[in-house]
């Protein structure tokens, strides 16, 4: 299966978010470092930049969207799971042109790639509940 430029952008954004969450370094510095050090061939760089910086800037707001639907405290959430959830919630809340089902399915695939063994199930559950609040008409 060919990986699309947008999927690659999402994968890279999750990796950059993970680095940012662990290091708490400047958002722009991590973006520049990531783009300089990673193989960005085949990625939608503009979409990566929007996803990464938009998600990082809105992280506190995105966290508040997911908190009511978490089965554990936010600070007990794994860094990968948090990055994937934040990114998907950014797409759901800020990118109305992305169908909600696409945002959720992409998050599930990211969790399968980067997360713990069954984290995709947890992420799917949180996003399904959160999506109904963010996009009540499921578009």
From Swiss-Prot:
Gene3D superfamilies: NusB-like (1.10.940.10). GO terms for molecular function: RNA binding. InterPro entries: NusB-like_sf (IPR035926), NusB_fam (IPR011605), NusB_RsmB_TIM44 (IPR006027). Pfam families: NusB. One of its GO terms (cellular component) is cytosol. Signal peptide: none annotated. SUPFAM superfamilies: NusB-like. One of its GO terms (biological process) is DNA-templated transcription termination. Keywords: RNA-binding, Transcription, Transcription antitermination, Transcription regulation. Belongs to the NusB family. Involved in transcription antitermination. Required for transcription of ribosomal RNA (rRNA) genes. Binds specifically to the boxA antiterminator sequence of the ribosomal RNA (rrn) operons. NCBIfam families: nusB (TIGR01951). This is Transcription antitermination protein NusB. The lineage of its organism: Bacteria, Pseudomonadati, Pseudomonadota, Gammaproteobacteria, Candidatus Palibaumannia.
């Amino acid at each position: 299966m060919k990986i699309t430029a947008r999927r690659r952008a999402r994968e890279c954004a999750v990796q950059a978010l993970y680095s940012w969450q662990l290091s708490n370094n400047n958002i722009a510095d991590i973006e520049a470092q990531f783009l300089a050090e990673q193989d960005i061939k085949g990625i939608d760089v503009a979409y990566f930049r929007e996803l990464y910086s938009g998600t990082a800037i809105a992280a506190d707001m995105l966290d508040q969207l997911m908190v009511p639907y978490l089965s554990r405290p936010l600070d007990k959430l794994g860094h990968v799971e948090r990055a994937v959830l934040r990114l998907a919630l950014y797409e759901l809340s800020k990118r109305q042109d992305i169908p909600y089902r696409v945002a959720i399915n992409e998050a599930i695939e990211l969790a399968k790639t980067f997360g713990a063994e069954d984290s995709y199930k947890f992420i799917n559950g949180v996003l399904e509940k959160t999506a109904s609040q963010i996009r009540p008409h499921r578009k």
